[in-house]
Amino acid sequence: MKAPARAAVGSRGIRALVLVMLGLLAILTFFPFYMMVIQATHTSEEILTTPPPLGPGVHSLHNYAKVVAVVPFWRNFLNSVIVSSSITALTLLFCSLGGYAFAVYQFPLKRVLFATLLGTMMLPWLVDLIPWFIIVTRLHWLNSFLALVVPSAVSAFGVFWMRQYISSNVPLELLDAARIDGCPEGLIFFRVVVPILTPALAALAIMNFLPSWNSFFYPLLVLTKAKVMTLPLVLNLLHGDPYRGMDYGVLMTATTMALAPVMIVFWLAARRFISGMTAGAIKG
């Protein structure tokens, strides 16, 4: 066999091996989600059988009825939508403005402020819990959405991310041309810069929406009333009595309902997310 033929065979073999590995990785990734959806259609007794059921059952409506009977699920669902959407919108606004300022303008102590901002990224997030809890308590924000939204309205990583993207993708000549035409600074940002930032904004939106939707520990500290709780706290209430056992079918139903919006948002914005991450990695 000639060298080119051997190289072609070796290339096809490597490609087949890569495809097999990717297939196995995909199965390992999605199988837990598949089991979650399947178990949402079974009772707890059926789930605990050996081997567990791998096909859909007939108790999905029964489990759903128990979920909405035990907790105000849809009210808590709306709470999560409001909190996560507010955090994401404010993060996009403030981080894009901060990144734009660091990328375009010159002002005193610019490097010092940016270095300080990056330094805060090295601190564990647990360090902020006690100061924020004290602030929220003194402002009488306990059991309100403000206690969740305000501390998360801006992130150091978001400012850094937008600053890097703007520095690499927004030409200063374009901004100068807009100023020559008499465009105010605010309109330059919203009409000239923001359309260029669409991939970066989409990526940042997903990176902030998912953690805010899944946040558990901090909301557990500042929310104690069921009517203002977010979905992760409600799922915790559905665990039931650990000594008498929990209803796994009900818990899996609520978990599936809670994860569905997150999966839909990610799938709809996946292309934007990938393009934003790729642009930031290549040009940043």
Model-derived features with residue positions:
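Short, Lys/Arg-rich, polar N-terminal cytosolic tail immediately upstream
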Residues: 1-10
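A structural signal for multi-pass alpha-helical bundles of membrane permease subunits
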Residues: 14-284
